[in-house]
């Protein structure tokens, strides 16, 4: 570690190293200087050193070095010159951003260069293997190596700066600016993973701010400037999350904003709240939570109407229409029906959380909470006057879906209204904080609601209905979609329907109608019948004469007297009932008064206990503050005692606070440190002079000692050289003697070597031959196994193909059999239809024949009798023959005696009347036209009367 007397020397040394290309050594030198304890007093030179330091860190992509240096520099200048730290950090981020942009501009394929899932993750083994196998040596790989590292370094830069600036009241603005730039980085380059981590980092910083409340320079969220900075950061986070499509992170951002507002107990400006509710509508719409989406729209409408006075009538109409359509899009049944107890509890907690996010007010008691529901939302729309601001199409749609009872043509009337609504919407004016409103997004949900309403109304009128008729009545969807909607409604206990696809019918299971539903049906039925009666029987004109008006005066007076007596008794009963109700109300009021008194007493006791607890806490805090003040004063006295100036400590009694005393102590310590550094610099300078003088005096002595040492070492070297030569001669003579001694055994060694080599060669040949035989056997056995396996596979495949062929033949035979049966059934049905048609024609011929015979009989009777008479009543004809003719002798029958029955036509003849009597009229006033229809009927058809079931829908249509 190099030591420099002055910081300027370190800066010069670093520049020299950079000039010769040794950037790593220059960075290390500056790092040692910055992290050294000698330079803890801020000076302008340190700022220049930090600029050079961050430039080297950016050039070499050393994020860890940059973080360590910035932390040390923050310690140095935090109490002296915080603006210097801001300038260094801004320069650092500017350099990192500039280098990242430069690398991005150099890359020609940005899409491939940025295709990295996580900037903090290393390369996976699979990616490395794929790159080596595929030989990725071209431009794509160079782009990855060029662009991705710089974006990774830029992301590390943002993280480092946020970590350094966190929870510091003097650096709040720079912290907010860095967070905004980090959000824009994630938004510009679609970095979803880094955005989630960034949100978590900011969330942890706020949690630590609330956790460590006694730290120095802690931001005060109750200050308007600090609160506005934090809120702006959170709203920017919310906007970027919605633009990136991270809806879960956007919802967590909403919770962060709500928690921040609850923490400081302040509501932001109306412009921010409009953005808040606008993003809530998008989040709830994407999560298919239509109820909360509608409530958020209602809050947004209230804000726009209350605070935005420049809003045009058209924009207000579109926003109000969105509110009503969002409310209508809410499913009309309970989504949590059939859930378990645990799921219901979780849903209650979730609903409570969302209600707090939407309304910012929560009832403390659970029994007093009003649950968010579709009915309460619609009633609130009416009470707040939203319906008066919507377009006429939306009003018509609301009336059709919520007030009308049209079980047959509801969907047909709703469809053109939805077509008009889908064309409404568009961009709003710049005055409105809502950029765009599209009403067409609600059309699918409204079509589903219209389908549910139609099925509900049909189920209240009919028992069965054909599937084809349902499809014709609902033009929005196919029957598969209608069936899916019906199944969901049945699962939620909204409908009770059974679908029989074999018969093509939909059975609407009988249910006991609720009083409300039956009342609505009866009301519509009464109105329809009243209109029909008025059309058939118009009201008669009032009598003009006074006598006609007073004809029943006595009866009217009697009725009026009875009515007055009944009214008097009713009034007496009502008075008694009212007195009883008053007594009951007094008892209830007394009970309530006692409960309120009891609750007041309990609240008073709680208040007294809370005040006592508060006083006790204040006393404890006062004791802690006094003790800390004493410790700080003692520290200040001790610092003054250590000081050489013997300055009297500044104490003003109760006016001195802990913060002031701590600042005095810190200033004193800083002054002592600076004086100590000056002394050390002076001492280092004197030591340099002393060392230089010592070395000048010691230089001649060292030179003479060196020459003497050279002479001694030369003599020693010559002596050791002679000794080594003598020893070498002695070793050579010994080696020659040893060679002569071993030369006589050379022949024996050769014989033994040949013997061993021959035996080893024979053994090697044998083992090689055995190995070859073993390999041949293994190869032969494997060939046999392979052949057997191939035969088995061939056999299995052949068998499988045979089975498949048999199966296909069987299926073809079954299809032919089914087609043959279907054809025979069609032929049989055609024959039956032909037989039925022939029988119908024969019956028509019989009727015509019978009619002609009847007319022939009438003509004969008219020709015989001088006066017309009523034709006789015909009996039932035979199965296949006509009616028997009446004999003509009956016309000239003699006059019977008294007491005998005489037919009517004979009595007419005997009386000799000039004209025939008029025909009798039935009691219904049907006229004198005789009934020419035959009195027989087809025995094959069941009678059309006497059925106890309700009329089905197709029958009523006929």
Swiss-Prot record:
Domain of life from the UniProt record: Eukaryota
Quaternary structure and interacting proteins, as annotated: Component of the eukaryotic translation initiation factor 3 (eIF-3) complex.
Family classification: Belongs to the eIF-3 subunit A family.
GO molecular function: mRNA binding; translation initiation factor activity
Keywords for the protein's UniProt record, in alphabetical order: Coiled coil, Cytoplasm, Initiation factor, Protein biosynthesis, RNA-binding
Record-given protein name: Eukaryotic translation initiation factor 3 subunit A
Pfam families in the cross-refs: eIF3a_PCI_TPR-like (PF22591), PCI (PF01399)
Organism: Nicotiana tabacum
Coiled coil, from the record: 93-123, 548-696, 796-861
Annotated localization: Cytoplasm
């Amino acid at each position: 570690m190099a030591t420099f007397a002055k910081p300027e020397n370190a800066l010069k040394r670093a520049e020299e190293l950079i000039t010769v290309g040794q950037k790593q050594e220059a960075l290390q030198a500056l790092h040692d200087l910055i992290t050294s304890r000698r330079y803890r007093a801020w000076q302008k030179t340190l700022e220049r050193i930090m600029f050079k330091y961050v430039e080297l860190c950016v050039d070499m992509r050393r994020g860890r070095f940059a973080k360590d240096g910035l932390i040390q520099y923050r310690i140095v200048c935090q109490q002296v010159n915080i603006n210097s730290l801001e300038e260094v950090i801004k320069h650092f981020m500017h350099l990192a951003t500039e280098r990242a942009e430069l690398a991005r501009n150099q890359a020609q394929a940005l899409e491939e260069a940025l295709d990295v899932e996580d900037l903090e993750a290393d390369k996976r083994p699979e990616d490395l293997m794929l790159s080596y196998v595929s030989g990725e040596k071209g431009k794509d790989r160079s782009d990855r190596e060029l662009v991705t590292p710089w974006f990774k370094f830029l992301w590390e830069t943002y993280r480092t700066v946020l970590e350094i600036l966190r929870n510091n009241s003097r650096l709040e603005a720079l912290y907010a600016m860095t967070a905004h730039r980090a959000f824009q980085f994630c938004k510009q380059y679609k970095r979803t993973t880094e955005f989630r981590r960034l949100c978590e980092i900011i969330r942890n910083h706020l949690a630590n701010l609330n956790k460590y409340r006694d730290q120095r320079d802690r931001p005060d969220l109750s200050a308007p400037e600090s609160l506005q900075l934090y809120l702006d950061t959170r709203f920017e986070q919310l906007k970027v999350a919605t633009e990136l499509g991270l809806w879960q992170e956007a919802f967590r951002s909403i919770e962060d904003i709500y928690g921040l507002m609850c923490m400081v107990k302040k509501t932001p400006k109306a412009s921010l709240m409009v953005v808040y509710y606008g993003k809530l509508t998008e989040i709830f719409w994407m999560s298919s939570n239509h109820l909360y989406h509608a409530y958020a729209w209602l809050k947004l409408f209230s804000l726009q109407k209350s605070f935005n006075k420049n809003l045009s009538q058209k924009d207000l109409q579109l926003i109000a229409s969105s509110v009503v359509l969002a409310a209508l899009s809410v499913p009309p049944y309970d989504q949590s029906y059939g859930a378990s107890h645990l799921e219901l509890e979780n849903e209650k907690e979730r609903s409570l959380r969302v209600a707090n996010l939407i309304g910012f007010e929560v009832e403390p008691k659970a029994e007093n909470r009003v649950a968010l529901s579709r009915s309460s939302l619609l009633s609130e729309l009416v009470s707040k006057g939203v319906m008066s601001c919507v377009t006429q199409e939306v009003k018509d749609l609301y009336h059709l879906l919520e007030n009308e009872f049209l079980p047959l043509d509801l969907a047909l009337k709703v469809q053109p209204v939805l077509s008009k609504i889908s064309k409404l919407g568009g961009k709003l004016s710049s005055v409105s904080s809502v950029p765009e409103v599209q009403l067409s997004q609600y059309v699918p949900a409204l079509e589903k609601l219209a389908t549910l309403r139609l099925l509900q109304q049909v189920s209240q009128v009919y028992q069965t209905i054909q599937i084809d008729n349902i499809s014709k009545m609902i033009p929005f969807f196919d029957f598969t979609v209608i069936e899916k909607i019906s199944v969901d409604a049945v699962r939620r206990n909204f409908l009770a329907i059974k679908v029989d696809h074999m018969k093509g019918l939909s059975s609407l299971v009988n249910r006991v109608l609720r009083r409300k539903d039956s009342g609505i049906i009866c009301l519509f039925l009464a109105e329809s019948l009243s209109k029909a009666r008025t059309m058939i029987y118009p009201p008669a004109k009032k009598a003009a004469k006074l006598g006609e008006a007073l004809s029943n005066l006595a009866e009217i007076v009697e009725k009026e007297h009875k009515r007055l007596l009944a009214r008097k008794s009713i009034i007496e009963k009502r008075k008694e009932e009212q007195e009883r109700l008053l007594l009951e109300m007094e008892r209830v009021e007394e009970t309530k008064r006692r409960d309120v008194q009891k609750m007041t007493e309990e609240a008073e006791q709680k208040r007294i206990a809370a005040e006592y607890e508060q006083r006790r806490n204040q006393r404890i805090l006062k004791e802690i503050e006094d003790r800390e003040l004493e410790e700080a004063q003692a520290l200040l006295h001790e610092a003054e005692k250590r000081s050489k100036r013997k300055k009297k400590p500044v104490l003003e009694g109760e006016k001195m606070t802990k913060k002031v005393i701590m600042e005095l102590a810190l200033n004193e310590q800083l002054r002592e440190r600076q004086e100590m550094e000056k002394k050390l610099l002076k001492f280092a300078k004197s030591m340099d002079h002393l060392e230089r003088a010592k070395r000048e005096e010691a230089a001649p002595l060292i030179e003479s000692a060196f020459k003497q040492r050279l002479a001694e070492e030369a003599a020693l070297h010559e002596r050791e050289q002679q000794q080594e030569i003598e020893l070498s001669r002695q070793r050579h003579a010994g080696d020659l003697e040893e060679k002569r001694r071993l030369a006589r055994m050379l022949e024996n060694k050769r014989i033994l070597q040949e013997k061993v080599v021959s035996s080893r060669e024979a053994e090697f040949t044998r083992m090689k031959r055995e190995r070859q035989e073993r390999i041949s056997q293994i190869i032969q056995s494997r060939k046999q196994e392979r052949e057997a396996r191939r035969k088995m596979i061939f056999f299995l495949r052949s068998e499988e193909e045979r089975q498949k062929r048999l199966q296909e033949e069987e299926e073809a035979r079954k299809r032919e059999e089914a087609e043959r049966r279907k054809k025979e059934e069609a032929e049989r049905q055609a024959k039956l239809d032909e037989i039925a048609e022939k029988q119908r024609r024969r019956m028509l011929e019989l009727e015509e024949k019978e009619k002609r015979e009847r007319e022939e009989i009438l003509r004969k009777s008219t020709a015989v009798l001088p006066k017309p008479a009523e034709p006789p009543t015909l009996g039932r004809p035979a199965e296949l023959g006509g009616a028997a003719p009446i004999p003509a002798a009956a016309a000239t029958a003699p006059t019977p005696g008294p007491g005998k029955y005489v037919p009517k036509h004979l009595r007419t003849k005997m009386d000799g009347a000039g004209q025939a009597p008029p025909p009798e009229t039935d009691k219904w006033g049907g006229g004198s036209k005789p009934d020419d229809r035959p009195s027989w009927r087809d025995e094959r058809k069941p009678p059309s009367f006497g059925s106890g079931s309700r009329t089905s829908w197709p029958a009523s249509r006929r």
